[in-house]
């Protein structure tokens, strides 16, 4: 494509001229390697952006595609690339016969330097030299002659307008110029030489290397002399910045390179040139372009200052000013914010304001700080500001240090590097650089147990008094936080600390035993909530004699609680009616109450938690003459049971049960005095606004596993109730996971175990021996748990037997078909959520218990036959039986079977009202003949007494063995006189067998918790759940 064709392709003269300017000013980069290739890539610098133009070539013609937003086939960038490609193609095909060159005759010729500069082309520095030839007799427009080559006789120049070759005898030039021209010829043959009009462009690194190795004197000289009083030129005021990185001293140009007119020498300041060769830019630029000139100028200026130059001046259209009058001064600070855990830098510039003779402060990242009225008094040097700030950010490598906001500092040298960077930074008057004190100064830690002077305890808190030299609480917390994150240093507000120092290790070892989340301080005192009293006393006793720290009443309280010593005011006959462990439980409850604590009574099912609470309440009301009511929150099925227990053991206390219509309950609440109010979970939820208007003496929640879900409305309602003493009753404080325990404590001792996230991070996620030990140690003073095996030696044995049965062939086939169909459906679902998997498991468990096909129920069920065999044998031996199942239709199926076989039975499930449930239990316990109680596992597992039963059958295996055990213990409890036989009927080669295997595998972890059984299946991953089918 010719120039004329390119002009036509551009369509408009304006577009062609713009493209021509891009091409002529060196803003188009097209590597020579693409010249003879079928496809290639060019880059165009356009308005500070790099535009990429891809092209395919065929027969010298280009088809281009541009990355710009214009999205046209003939944009200005494509036109510029076509011009560049045309030039390179013409030059590659051009060949000249040197013997036919047009000879220019003269007596003497000389090189006239037209311009000198450095240009950055495609990421590398090039030396640019433009020169013309001056002839004393004939001068054919020297500006259009370009150096072509040179030999020992002639210098050849190419006429750019008519593509003709001209020659001049080499001998006509002075010796230095002859050597220079021969040197140019050598460079042109060794390197890829670029041309810009009549200028030569050489790669700077190669150019300097060859020049320094050259032995012949040329017009090039190296000069490291320092020149003072340098004047920098600023051409155009409207640009608000430097647009020429060039200096003058007198009449001498002081650029990166300088041309001495008189001596006809080009002076290269090699020290600066070598410094600048390290810079790499991803695009083609010219250093005289404004947006790149200022950053480049700053690096040049800072180098001069480091090399000892002092006085600099700037020239505008109407004046010459000193550097400080023209350039703004940077104030740059790097600091670490220990509260936000952030490394931050702040920078601002101060400009001389010529309008009001003052200064204007400008924040680069907060432009609004520069007042609009000040704009007439100074000009912002935006790119200069950016260059200066980036320079100092690079010096401190802030990107490297900011990674420590997320990663631990594991070597103190990593923090010492800040001070090293500041020390290595040579000060210049262009900037004032500083670091925050906490990055510069290391401070030794002081720790001594002797600093603890006294401990005082009141109704709400513990006061620890320390000597003035002791470490403050805020710093202790910060040190522990840094330590737990894996840091070996701790950065405080004013200094940093080495955590590997002996004193720091001792401090961490000591204070790491405390829970300081709720601790406060006022100088030399640290305050802890009172519920940490026993833990604090135990820790201090390892190091000091606590009798020298606590007052006598406090020491007695600690010893009494540890030894469970409490003087009850109950009559001797009443208290002696309780078993010894129950008396201990009453004392324990009263001790917690007197010390303003709360607690969890977690005795195993069947040990009489209800009666212990009743006697504690009775003793408290009699001894303290309490005028407030107390509140007991229970499942609906236990309302009447609690009422009857109060009537039996404490008839002198008035009891109100909120099992009346809602319209009447409001009046009941208003008239409460020193009475006991018993409400169900549901009534509490609906009447929470009315109930929370009252303050209670005791607030007791029975079956406290009902508030394990902290987001449920019942849990939220329970935690709103105001009471002097809060107590939770549960046989399974940890039913599913450790968070169950947290929720109970959040009711009885709010904040004691931190918030939910803190507890999860510390205990739930870790699940290590150390975390379990810490949890048990912290909670043990406030949990009382006894098991039947330890306190009831006279209680008969509970014998558990697992009976494995094989499904008959038809049943097994039905099971496997359902299993395979379900797994295939899960496989097809993209979202393999645990819900889909658990649904399949539930179906299979149900199918094991009650085989159904399209025709109805299959009568020949191996599990049913095994259960009936046990039941028939028990009835023959005059024994009552409880059969637990999860499925209502299994209960109905057995009901029909018992009718046919004439077996007496009772049904106890969620379909029965609380009142009728109480009646059913009494009928079953009082029945004279052997009979069967068909009970749903959940309904039968809460608050009932079934000691008449001697045989317990679990027809379908439950996820959570804690729930199974809880149901079993309704028969195996106080009052049981005979051995209880427990049977679990398990179908082999089914999901039931796999569930039992996984439960057994978890026993090691279970043994470390507060209860015998934990429902691990709720925490299994989808992959672990799917492995149950293997």
Curated annotation (Swiss-Prot):
Entry-linked Pfam families: Helicase_C (PF00271), SNF2-rel_dom (PF00176), SWIM (PF04434)
EC code(s) of this entry: 3.6.4.-
Enzyme class, first EC level, given as a word: hydrolase
SMART domains the record matches: DEXDc, HELICc
Spans through the membrane: none
The entry's keywords: ATP-binding, Helicase, Hydrolase, Metal-binding, Nucleotide-binding, Zinc, Zinc-finger
Annotated ATP binding sites: 603-610
ZnF (SWIM-type) residues: 51-86
SUPFAM superfamilies: P-loop containing nucleoside triphosphate hydrolases
Keyword set includes Zinc: yes
Extent of the signal sequence: none
Chain ranges of the Helicase ATP-binding domain: 590-751
Domain Helicase C-terminal: 867-1021
Gene3D superfamilies, alphabetized: P-loop containing nucleotide triphosphate hydrolases, Tandem AAA-ATPase domain
Domain of life: Bacteria
A GO MF label: helicase activity
Protein family per UniProt: Belongs to the SNF2/RAD54 helicase family.
Name assigned to this protein: Uncharacterized ATP-dependent helicase MPN_020
Organism field: Mycoplasma pneumoniae (strain ATCC 29342 / M129 / Subtype 1)
